[in-house]
Amino acid sequence: MALIQMTLFEKPETNNHVADSYTGIYSMHKYWSKKPHNIIRDFILKYSKEHEIVVDPFCGSGISITESVFTNRKAIGIDINPSAIFITRQMLSKISSKDLTTAFKIIEYKCKDKINNNYLIRRDGKSFVGTHFYWENKTLTEVWYSRGKSKVVEKPTYEDIELAKSFNVTNIPYYYPKRNLFHNSRINANREQHVYDLFTPRNLTSLALLLDEINKISNQKIKDILKFIFTSSMGQASRMVFAVKRRGKYNGKSRLSERKEVGSWVIGYWIPKENFEINVWNCFENRFKKVLKAKKKQEGNGYLLDEAKDFSELSQGNKNLLLLNESVISALKKIPNDSVDYIITDPPHGNRIPYLELSMMWNEWLCHNVNYDDEIIVSESKDRKKDLDNYNALLKESLNQIDRVLKPNRYFSFIFNSIDDDTWINLVNLLNSFSFDLEKVETLGYSANSVVQDNREGGLKTDFIFTFRKNPANIKNKIELLTINKKKNQINEKIDECIIKSKNGLEMYEIINYLVMEFFKKNKFFKLSEVLNIIKEDYSKVDNKWMKKEIVK
């Protein structure tokens, strides 16, 4: 493999990328492992030109696709997850803010009062609309509502409790998802659970009514953006919203405050013992306002959007977007040899994020057909039989197709993060088996509001971006695996080198970043678990940074 020289410390602005926060259209809808749009744009600008074809075979929420279109490229977004393609299309869709507001007002007229009636609070002969209901171990213990300009927090009355109990899933006259979750303890999913169990019967009833009215909208473009707002608001309407209890001081002593703050649905299907039930209409309206603000700003963007039906139409005409909801292997097989100018992608990282399982809530509400069998993932769900062997086989064929469709001497950027030894070693060997010359290894920081950053000791707090050049004359060299038994000295030398260069010590992940950069370019790699043990045994930790023991003394 050929590689230009780089280090973690020289020219850090080019090798270690700092993320912007998710704002505007990128904050409209949750999706896991979103990559910072500013960094993705930099790569697209560097490795492709206007009107060239950029492909993301695992496009997720479509950040690479939107940035390609915004920078006047032709973009192909592929993802096996229907929700991913749906979100990507809505991110790019230019919607008239006037038409969207009109449609919202129609939904508001038909639904708001009906939904709010499900949350009525009666006090002193007057009716108020409840905003939040606090549950502890499935018992309603607190109700929140507005009384004039005042926010009221009270214990529930008998009438409040009976109203909440009056809702039953068997009595809902509208569609709601009844599918069981896959059993996966990693994401707190139990096969005995249904999708509808993620919601209180009252919120389930309200959501079903809301979606039923949205589905009656005749304009498909408007209907889709309203569905997008619906799924975007769904997490906050679920039972997965936890309570935040702040610590404060009383008489000089630290204690938990009685006042609770509303948390949010983060990742997985964990239902806290103490959780909020939030008024569904408020969830939907709040998300509508956020989407409307982003879409108003997007209206002024100068880009044009013209979606193609297939690769031929995209490549030969003026079309600039092709979205394919299918497996990466079957989608890439439809693309001719040596026909793509740049590929950038962030594939599933082993068992880190089971995308289709996590997206089941959205996919089932929107009645999407999902191909679980061909997902490239390692899942801890025994229901799925998605082990490392299956992952490696599918990833290998995907890389084979990427190699085939990329033009000679053009670039392929591959984003990755894992703390699993076997996943890393297999990936390194796979990448080495194709006609790719490694050009550069860089790190990508997470956005400040990312929910997937691994903060465990030894967790990689940045992703790696490996950029390759397709070289048909590539000479393949076998990857040498450095082990503690045979090559510990080489590993120690590199750790010493990076710590000395840093002067003030490094965090664990920074040392790992340096070792990956230094060894991979020399066709060498290591077991992450062994390196973590070397660091813990041979170095000293001071204020979360590792140093040579003699320096600490």
For the regions a protein language model found, what residue spans apply to each?
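Nucleic-acid modification enzymes, centered on SAM-dependent nucleic-acid methyltransferases
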Residues: 3-54, 71-336, 352-384, 398, ...
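Class I SAM-dependent methyltransferase "Motif I" SAM/SAH-binding loop
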Residues: 58-62
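Conserved SAM-binding loop of SAM-dependent methyltransferases across substrates and taxa
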Residues: 63-72
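Conserved Class I SAM-dependent methyltransferase catalytic core
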Residues: 213, 378-439
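Hydrophobic beta-strand segment of the Class I
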Residues: 343-344
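Charged low-complexity interaction tracts in eukaryotic proteins
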Residues: 479-481, 522-553
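Short amphipathic alpha-helical interface segments
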Residues: 495-503
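Short acidic, hydrophobic short linear motifs in intrinsically disordered regions
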Residues: 502-515
